[in-house]
Amino acid sequence: MSRVSFIDTTVLCNLVPVPGRDQNADEVRREMKERLARGERFILPITSVVETGNFIAQVSDGQLRRQTAEKLAAILNLICEGKAPWVLHDVAWDRAFLKTLLDGADTMSSYVEHAVNKVGAGDLCIITERFYFQERSSVRAGIWTFDAGLRAHA
């Protein structure tokens, strides 16, 4: 399998784009083209979908909110259909996932230590989801993000 990257909310909001959260949209589109040309594949972690969906729900203009929601829905449908460059990653939200999250996945720091260092639970969920993907697939995966705290673990 070619390189795989988990897409953080900061990038997904620019890909959709979500009004007010798309300040890097041109840069993201340009980088997406470069990554696609290299054969990179992408996974949308649950956290990114939920957070982006919440940001869309906060768009004040109803028509723009609908158009933006339709764009995110189109991306999610491509994932459901297994269409490249998207990879569907099945992950269970269960006791094992929560325990791994609390242990900090493969970061060698607990959730509490991450929180103290300003790495949120959402970011740690992405790290944990990536950990499970790598364990199951034996494919090293990165995280594409603009978030400095998360980038330290990308």
Please place each PLM-identified region on the residue numbering.
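Short, well-structured N-terminal submotif of metal-dependent ribonuclease cores
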Residues: 1-47, 55-72
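Short active-site loop/helix that positions an aromatic residue
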Residues: 152-154
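Active-site neighborhoods of divalent-metal-dependent phosphate/nucleic-acid chemistry enzymes
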Residues: 80-149
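Surface-exposed alpha-helical segments enriched in charged/polar residues
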Residues: 30-37, 77, 128-131
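Acidic, glycine-rich loop-and-strand cores that form catalytic or ligand-binding grooves
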Residues: 71-79
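Phosphate-coordination/substrate-recognition cap region in phosphate-metabolizing enzymes
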Residues: 51
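Alpha-helix capping/helix-boundary segments
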Residues: 11, 48, 126, 149-150
